[in-house]
Amino acid sequence: MFDVALYGHLTHDRILNKFKQSATVGSIGNVWKTLKSINPKLRIDLQPTEIGEALIYINEDISERTSVANLSLYTNYSPNINKTKFSHIIYLNELTNTSFITDLNSTYISADMCAGKQLKDLSVLKNLDFLFISDEDMYYDIEELRLLVKKSVIVHCPSGSICYNKEDTIISTVDIIENINVLGAGDMFAASFINSFLNTSDINNSVTVAHNTVSKLLNNEN
């Protein structure tokens, strides 16, 4: 059995930080990198269903980034489904096919959403235990999302997060880190939460751990 399985988007990211250029593997790559950096012993199954590329501009002066992308140059609508403890789906709202989600053989399932298209078929959320979404991309009725997802909708931002559980709402605050490269911060957050939840099964504590881990990782990378 795998500890974590990653589905959804894998991207070739071309990055411009002012006039400095670099390239990296993004989306699934960001989540995989974070999981392995905080817990190298994790058994991770990589099953990208859509592969594409993105051009990303970073402005460290105001800790922002923007991008244009073609996320679905290549598609595989029949990924291998292996038994795993926790499955995570990257960029759910940009997937051109979500049919594989109902076949996932996993104790827990989560997904995140990104800037771009709105998720049209919200019924797919009924398959999820957790949904991660940035406050920038929050175009939805939170109460509708909370009703659909099995456990929690976690809305995160640079200053913290709001965790909408079935029975309560938990607000977490953190110090904003100024003048940094925030690329991949949302992916780091999801990965850190997943690793903590696998160890503790505690939602609210895992949110706190995720914030602390992301702050540490961003400080180390900048």
For each predicted feature, which ranges?
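Substrate-binding N-lobe of the ribokinase-like
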Residues: 2-62, 70-73, 195
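Active-site metal-binding loops of divalent metal-dependent hydrolases
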Residues: 8-10, 136, 188
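Electropositive phosphate-/nucleotide-binding environments in soluble metabolic enzymes
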Residues: 12, 22-25, 29, 92-95, ...
